[in-house]
Amino acid sequence: NHSWDVHKGLPKRMKDQSAPMLDAGLSGLIADLDERGILDETLVVCVGEFGRSPQLGISTSGNGNSADGRDHWPYCYTGVVAGAGIKRGYVHGKSDKTASAPIEKPVHPRELLATIYHSFGIDPETLVYNHLNQPRELVKAQAVTELFT
């Protein structure tokens, strides 16, 4: 029974469960797609909806945390994007030393979505019509084109 919601026991769970499972699964998927020659036509995106608080034991959302847990933190988190023309080994952006806030090249979730559309050859600002027949952009954001070769 595994969960990424680590309000308690973060160091042990990351070392013994979460990190090894993600490392093996994600690296295995990317390597397999590459070996089969289909990584360049497949976009792999690995991201959560928020990060974890920079300090152990601090409650930021009202959830109870033990001294070895971290709470929800929407201000700074990481993601992995690979394949489909993404530069290999490229690191985009930088956080401060405690991972509390981005300090270089932050990417908003809207920009990530625009980047996904861009990788498919779809203009992120394409107009679509909602259920009331009102025009809306797919996403009001620019793709992070620096990620691409």
Regions found by a protein language model. Name each.
Residues 1-149:
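Ligand-binding pockets and gating/stacking loops
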